[in-house]
C-alpha cells in the first residue's frame, strides 16, 4: 500500500512524503507545479549535493527561472540521508557512510522513479519532455538515473568524476555514462578538492552522446561561477522547448 502526504513547502513549492509497505524509508521531496493548466508539461528532475537537501541552491533559482515557461514542472527529492530523512550527523559525513552500502545507488534510482511516477499519476500529467539537473552527489545518482528506462531528453551534470570522492562507484558511473545518448552539459571545477581532473575527463569521455559539452572553470568544488548556472538553465530551456535542436558548426573557423 502506498500513500502520499502533502504540505506547504518553501520557495513556492509543495512538499510531499511518499510511504509504502515495500519501501525501507519514506521518499521526501518538493514539486513546483507549472503555472499553466497543461496536462502535458515538461518536467525537470533536480538532484542536490551531499551537503544539502531538496532546497539547496541553485534548485530554487532554477525552479523560478524555468517556471517562467509556464508549462514546466520542477521535481526535487531529498538524498538518501538528507532533508526530511536526515541521518545524523548529516551532510557529507552521513552520505559517505551511506556509500558503503552496495545498493545505495539502486535504492536512490528507485526513489526517483517512484517519486516521478507518483507525481505524474497524482496530477494526471503526461509529460512532453523530461530533463535532469544535478551536480556533485546529484551526478552520482543522476548518471544511473539517466541510464535507466526513463526517457530523458537532456541533462545538466558535473562536479563529479570517476575517481576521488566517487572512487567506490567509479566503474558503475563509467558503465552507466556509456548508456546516455541525449544532450549533456557538464560542469567542471579545475581545482576541485574532491575530484581530480583525470576522473572528471574520464567520466565526460564515457558519456555516449556526441551532443555533449564541458565548461571548466578555475576554483574549488563549490566555486561554480553564477554564469554557468544561467547557462545550465538556458541549455535545459533550449532542449525542453524546441522539437529539434541541432548544433551548428562553423567549419573551418580559421585558415
Predicted feature residues:
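Short beta-strand/loop motif that positions the catalytic acidic residue
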Residues: 180, 186-188
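Primarily recognizes the serine-hydrolase "nucleophile elbow" in alpha/beta-hydrolase
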Residues: 110-179
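Short beta-strand element of the alpha/beta-hydrolase
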Residues: 39-49
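Alpha/beta-hydrolase active-site loop
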Residues: 90, 94-123
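N-terminal cap/lid segment of alpha/beta-hydrolase-fold proteins
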Residues: 1-39
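Short alpha-helix in the alpha/beta-hydrolase fold that links the catalytic acid
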Residues: 59-60, 145, 169-173, 182, ...
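C-terminal catalytic histidine-bearing segment of alpha/beta-hydrolase fold enzymes
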Residues: 202, 209-255
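Short amphipathic alpha-helix adjacent to the substrate-entry channel of hydrolases
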Residues: 56-77
Amino acid at each position: 500500500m502506498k500513500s502520499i502526504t502533502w504540505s506547504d513547502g518553501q520557495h513556492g513549492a509543495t512538499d510531499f512524503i511518499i510511504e509504502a509497505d515495500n519501501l525501507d524509508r519514506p521518499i521526501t521531496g518538493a514539486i513546483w507545479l507549472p503555472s499553466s493548466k497543461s496536462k502535458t508539461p515538461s518536467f525537470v528532475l533536480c538532484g542536490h549535493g551531499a551537503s544539502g537537501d531538496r532546497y539547496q541552491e541553485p534548485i530554487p533559482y532554477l525552479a523560478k527561472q524555468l517556471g517562467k515557461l509556464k508549462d514546466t514542472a520542477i521535481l526535487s527529492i531529498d538524498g538518501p540521508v538528507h532533508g526530511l530523512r536526515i541521518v545524523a550527523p548529516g551532510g557529507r559525513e552521513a552520505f559517505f557512510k551511506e556509500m558503503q552500502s552496495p545498493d545505495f545507488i539502486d535504492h536512490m534510482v528507485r526513489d526517483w522513479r517512484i517519486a516521478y511516477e507518483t507525481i505524474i499519476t497524482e496530477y494526471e500529467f503526461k509529460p512532453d519532455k523530461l530533463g535532469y539537473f544535478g551536480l556533485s552527489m546529484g551526478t552520482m545518482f543522476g548518471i544511473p538515473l539517466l541510464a535507466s528506462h526513463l526517457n530523458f531528453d537532456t541533462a545538466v551534470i558535473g562536479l563529479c568524476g570517476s575517481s576521488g570522492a566517487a572512487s567506490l562507484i567509479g566503474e558503475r558511473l563509467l558503465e552507466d555514462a556509456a548508456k546516455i545518448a541525449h544532450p549533456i552539459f557538464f560542469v567542471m571545477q579545475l581545482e576541485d578538492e574532491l575530484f581530480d581532473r583525470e576522473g572528471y575527463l574520464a567520466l565526460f569521455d564515457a558519456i555516449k552522446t556526441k551532443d555533449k559539452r564541458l565548461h571548466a572553470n578555475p576554483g574549488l568544488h563549490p566555486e561554480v561561477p553564477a554564469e554557468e548556472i544561467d547557462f545550465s538553465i538556458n541549455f535545459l530551456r533550449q532542449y525542453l522547448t524546441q522539437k529539434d535542436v541541432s548544433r551548428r558548426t562553423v567549419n573551418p573557423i580559421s585558415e
